[in-house]
């Protein structure tokens, strides 16, 4: 019976492009990986702690909430655009302007063009 693999990456393992590429290779190498969990990139947790220590408790939610929004409808347009492809992972990065997807390399150019058309044309 095949097993279900859950891959979890965070910290320095998602700190930069090379590290993320290594994570992607791990996921692709195991066909039983069905769930990929990403936590904060290297240093993000420390930045959040510093933010929390430097701001009054009543201000924290407002300050953090200001950066954790996405323009109405953009997420739906992204999901609608990629629904016909085999997307193995979608992750928002440390910025709400950063969306990462793990897809088969032969479809990557087509997906990028489709997303560009959907979001910018």
UniProtKB/Swiss-Prot annotation:
It comes from Haemophilus influenzae (strain ATCC 51907 / DSM 11121 / KW20 / Rd). InterPro entries: AceGlu_kinase-like_sf (IPR036393), ACT_Aspartokinase (IPR054352), AsparK_Bifunc_asparK/hSer_DH (IPR042199), Aspartate_kinase_CS (IPR018042), LysC_ACT_2 (IPR047962). One of its GO terms (biological process) is amino acid biosynthetic process. GO terms for molecular function: aspartate kinase activity. This is Putative inactive aspartokinase 3 HI_1632. Belongs to the aspartokinase family. It holds the Pfam family ACT_9. PANTHER family: ASPARTATE KINASE, ASPARTOKINASE.
